């Protein structure tokens, strides 16, 4: 792992443990995951829709709202490099620059407002994949990103429903997307996306 603190040193972990430092001082992984799940679920229910105009600061605000009870660094961009399997996420030193550039592109596309469903799915898959590769936070990027795009979809007249999406298929689609093939991700989003108010 490379970071600004020295090779192999992860300041987010308790010394000698593979456990994230947390405000609850929990040092058992399963207990920490359960506490995080419960607390973020409560916080997620209180997050307001937010403005149409959104950028990296808005994504950081969502993360801070979700994880403020658990991590002191909630809402702060990560300062170490992280991986999922063999797939590296964006080098930490480039997150802010790349994230702002990506959000600028999203703004220039009008935050995907006014697109027909097929085009919305195509562009949503692109931006979702790009922000996933960015993975701006040490943990919790996925949940913050999901809420960010749920809000974006609502502003664009759509809604996202994640029910029935298998974790393995989702992870594989994101890995393929990181390698430049968005086909599987687009197929998943074609099922996830529906017009706002549309009943199943």
Curated annotation (Swiss-Prot):
Kindly give the InterPro entries that the UniProt entry links to this protein: Fido, Fido-like_dom_sf
What's the catalysed reaction? L-tyrosyl-[protein] + ATP = O-(5'-adenylyl)-L-tyrosyl-[protein] + diphosphate; L-threonyl-[protein] + ATP = 3-O-(5'-adenylyl)-L-threonyl-[protein] + diphosphate
Q: What is the effect of changing residue 55 to R?
A: Inhibitory effect on cell division induced by cAMP with temperature sensitivity
Give the EC class as a word.
transferase
Swiss-Prot/TrEMBL keywords: ATP-binding, Nucleotide-binding, Nucleotidyltransferase, Transferase
- Gene Ontology BP annotations: regulation of cell division
Please list the residue ranges annotated as the Fido domain.
54-195
What is the name attached to this protein's record? Probable protein adenylyltransferase Fic
The organism encoding this protein is Escherichia coli (strain K12)
Q: What is the lineage of its organism?
A: Bacteria, Pseudomonadati, Pseudomonadota, Gammaproteobacteria, Enterobacterales
Q: Which gene encodes it?
A: fic
